[in-house]
Amino acid sequence: MIILGIDEAGRGPLSGPVVAAGVILDQDKIIDGLADSKKLTEKKRQSLYQQIITHAKAYTIVEISPQQIDELNILQATLKAIHQVANNLERQFDKVLVDGNKLPNWDYNSEAIVKGDSKIIEISAASILAKVHRDNICLEHDRLYPQYGFAKHKGYPTKEHLENIKKYGVLDIHRKSYKPVQVLLNE
């Protein structure tokens, strides 16, 4: 049975896109060290990212913008990204396994698996692609807006990030529907 593993990264940050990735592994090419991306060092994630995109049978990465997140809400934006991942790889898999407890409304043979990123290697691989891709976007944001410190906090609502929004203002990459950003917009 050919499995498509899907995971997302970036639901909690105040800025940047939510990213979903899907991976179909080549059963003849074993990738050692696949695990939940949050449990790996940045260096290990980068190394595995390269191995996954080189050796996977197929993969895709989908971004949903902060503007779409604000329009839809984060849950619907995440489900939209997951659905788009499956559509991008349509007819290449027998079953979809998604990390978490919710599935989009679709006709695919699928299952949501809580903590799937630490149980299913296809989901682990997707977790790594989504996390590294999103972290790279944050590094680009840091290059464009160095005073905000995106390389450090990756958009999460740290004390430093909130202070920098207060000091320098809300950017287009910020999620205006998120309460901490709304509070700062209304000050």
UniProtKB/Swiss-Prot annotation:
Needed cofactors: Mn(2+); Mg(2+)
Organism the protein comes from: Francisella tularensis subsp. holarctica (strain LVS)
Catalytic activity: Endonucleolytic cleavage to 5'-phosphomonoester
Cofactor note (record): Manganese or magnesium. Binds 1 divalent metal ion per monomer in the absence of substrate. May bind a second metal ion after substrate binding.
Residues reported in the UniProt entry to bind a divalent metal cation: D7, E8, D99
Any one GO cellular component localisation term in the record: cytoplasm
GO biological process: DNA replication, removal of RNA primer; mismatch repair
Compartments, record wording: Cytoplasm
Designated gene of the protein: rnhB
Main location: cytoplasm
UniProt EC number: 3.1.26.4
Family: Belongs to the RNase HII family.
Domain RNase H type-2: 1-187
This protein's record includes keyword Transcription: no
Keyword annotations from UniProtKB, A to Z: Cytoplasm, Endonuclease, Hydrolase, Manganese, Metal-binding, Nuclease
Name this polypeptide is given: Ribonuclease HII
Uppermost EC category: hydrolase
A single GO molecular function term of this UniProt record: manganese ion binding
Pfam families the UniProt entry points to: RNase_HII (PF01351)
NCBIfam families: PRK00015.1-3 (NF000595), PRK00015.1-4 (NF000596)
Highest classification ranks of the organism: Bacteria, Pseudomonadati, Pseudomonadota, Gammaproteobacteria, Thiotrichales
InterPro entries for the chain: RNase_HII (IPR022898), RNase_HII/HIII (IPR001352), RNase_HII/HIII_dom (IPR024567), RNaseH-like_sf (IPR012337), RNaseH_sf (IPR036397)
Functional description taken from the UniProt entry: Endonuclease that specifically degrades the RNA of RNA-DNA hybrids.
